[in-house]
């Protein structure tokens, strides 16, 4: 059976993730409404701006239903801002009232914009657990993981910082594999469903 994976389409790299998921063998659709969230087997939370996505989750009445689906074990993959939101704790979450809100899917503390501002964005090849050759990773105002819980597996590091993790059905990267054309990370996620 083909997994139906939703891409949270409130803000961020929606189209790129949809294409990557389809190329990786999944049925993929956008999620903007509660009915669409209820219809998917798994969810991708794309890169974008974590405080903006948090605000829109509240505005669209998706925050608590999404937290509930995650608590029930719905598989999720978060890239960049998605990694930030999947954390149990966010360092430098933003201005109170407009801060990024943790969805508490992965037992980790993530620091927003840890590698620096937009001008500090970079690309590089990194080793990734489960892949035979390095991944070309694109870091755009990227976070890094500062703390992981005992059940979290580190999948990749860059400059000695944790940039990819997995905990059960939850998977996250600080970088943007959807923009490189390399579908191996999306395939790892889809194949885990």
UniProtKB/Swiss-Prot annotation:
GO terms for biological process: glutamine catabolic process; pyridoxal phosphate biosynthetic process; pyridoxine metabolic process. The keyword Transport does not apply. L-glutamine binds at residues 48-50, 112, 140-141. Pfam families: SNO. One of its GO terms (molecular function) is pyridoxal 5'-phosphate synthase (glutamine hydrolysing) activity. It catalyses: aldehydo-D-ribose 5-phosphate + D-glyceraldehyde 3-phosphate + L-glutamine = pyridoxal 5'-phosphate + L-glutamate + phosphate + 3 H2O + H(+); L-glutamine + H2O = L-glutamate + NH4(+). GO terms for cellular component: cytosol; glutaminase complex. InterPro entries: Class_I_gatase-like, PdxT/SNO, PdxT/SNO_CS. Keywords: Glutamine amidotransferase, Hydrolase, Lyase, Pyridoxal phosphate. SUPFAM superfamilies: Class I glutamine amidotransferase-like. PROSITE patterns: PDXT_SNO_1, PDXT_SNO_2. Its EC number is 4.3.3.6, 3.5.1.2. It comes from the Bacteria. The active site is at residues 80, 176, 178. Pathway: Cofactor biosynthesis; pyridoxal 5'-phosphate biosynthesis. Belongs to the glutaminase PdxT/SNO family. Catalyzes the hydrolysis of glutamine to glutamate and ammonia as part of the biosynthesis of pyridoxal 5'-phosphate. The resulting ammonia molecule is channeled to the active site of PdxS. In the presence of PdxS, forms a dodecamer of heterodimers. Only shows activity in the heterodimer. HAMAP family: PdxT (MF_01615). This is Pyridoxal 5'-phosphate synthase subunit PdxT. The gene is pdxT.
């Amino acid at each position: 059976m083909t997994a139906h994976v939703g891409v949270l389409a409130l803000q961020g790299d929606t189209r790129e993730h949809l294409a990557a998921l389809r190329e990786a063998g999944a049925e993929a659709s956008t999620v903007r409404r509660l009915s669409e969230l209820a219809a998917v087997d798994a969810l991708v939370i794309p890169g974008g701006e974590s405080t903006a996505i948090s605000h829109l989750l509240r505005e669209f009445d998706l925050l608590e239903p999404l937290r509930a689906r995650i608590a029930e074990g719905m598989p999720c993959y978060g890239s960049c801002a998605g990694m930030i939101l999947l954390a149990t704790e966010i360092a430098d979450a933003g201005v109170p009232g407009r801060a990024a809100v943790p969805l508490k899917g992965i037992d980790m503390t993530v620091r927003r914009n840890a590698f620096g501002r937009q001008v500090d964005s970079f690309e590089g090849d990194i080793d990734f657990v489960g892949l035979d050759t390095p991944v070309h990773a694109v870091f755009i105002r990227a976070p890094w993981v500062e703390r992981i819980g005992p059940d979290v597996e580190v999948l990749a590091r860059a400059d000695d910082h944790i940039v990819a993790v997995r905990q059960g059905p939850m998977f996250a990267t600080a970088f943007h594999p959807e923009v490189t054309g390399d579908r191996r990370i999306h395939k790892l996620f889809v194949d885990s469903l």
